[in-house]
A protein has these predicted regions:
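Gly/Pro-enriched, hydrophobic low-complexity segments
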Residues: 1-7, 13-69, 107, 113-210
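Compact functional segments
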Residues: 202-225
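Mature hydrolase/peptidase catalytic cores and their serpin-fold inhibitory cores, especially
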Residues: 69-135, 217-225
């Protein structure tokens, strides 16, 4: 559920994932606060746009990459040491005003931390016959956690047009290594989108008990009322 900004607050989404998204695509429903109704989304995968992102984020950039891998040709380019976003505890601090985090062209660099880490470099090239804003993607995957830390995004002309970063921390009490904030930059348009701002929100409840019925259109409808 979207909690901010106010013009989007109340919109919500529920997704049912499948184990093999090549054979069976995910199902998704969206509650629109303005219409006060739930609609089935015909497609929330590949290059379809995420709702409420002003066209900044395709469906498959959530969690740095998600969904079926079949539209790309994949290649392992090897391992290298690179400066990567890591241990982003300053960015995760409670009570920081979001206006201090989000600057005009980028996230406030004073709150970011980058460290030298060994990463696996994986390149994905769009297969012939398919379309996507990102004709090539280069993933930098943490050797220790297997978290995707950064992604270079190239357009059909081979130009670097975008960048994703996962600013991650250890949730020691779980335990789990996960991003506290994900960013995607449109280098051509001079815009960026962030996902995961929680400095002024309640902390995740990793022990919540969920039921299958919580992930249905009916549950989404009840949530939106």
């Amino acid at each position: 559920r979207v909690v901010a900004p106010s013009k989007l607050a109340g919109n919500a989404l529920v997704v049912q994932e499948t184990l093999d998204q090549v054979l069976s695509i995910r199902k998704a429903w969206r509650f629109n606060r303005g219409e006060r109704r739930v609609r089935r989304l015909p497609m929330l995968a590949y290059d379809s746009l995420q709702p409420d992102t002003s066209g900044m984020a395709t469906a498959d950039v959530v969690d740095m990459y998600n969904g079926a891998p079949d539209r790309y040709q994949w290649a392992l380019l090897g391992k290298r040491e690179m400066l990567m976003p890591y241990n982003s505890y300053a960015l995760h601090q409670k009570g920081i005003p979001y206006t201090d985090i989000l600057q005009e062209k980028h996230v406030n660099p004073a709150l970011l931390r980058h460290e030298l880490h060994r990463v696996w470099v994986v390149e994905a090239t769009l297969r012939t016959g398919f379309s996507h804003p990102y004709a090539k993607r280069r993933f930098y995957i943490d050797e220790d956690s297997w978290q995707i830390l950064a992604v270079d995004l190239y357009n059909k002309n081979g130009e670097l047009s975008g960048l994703q970063e996962a600013h991650s921390i250890n949730y020691y009490d779980v335990p789990m290594f996960m991003s506290t904030l994900e960013t995607i930059y449109d280098l051509k348009g001079g815009r960026y989108f962030v996902d995961g701002l929680d400095n002024n929100e309640p902390m995740y409840d990793f022990n919540v008990q969920l039921k299958k019925s919580d992930f249905t259109a009916a549950a989404l409808r009840r949530e939106g009322i």
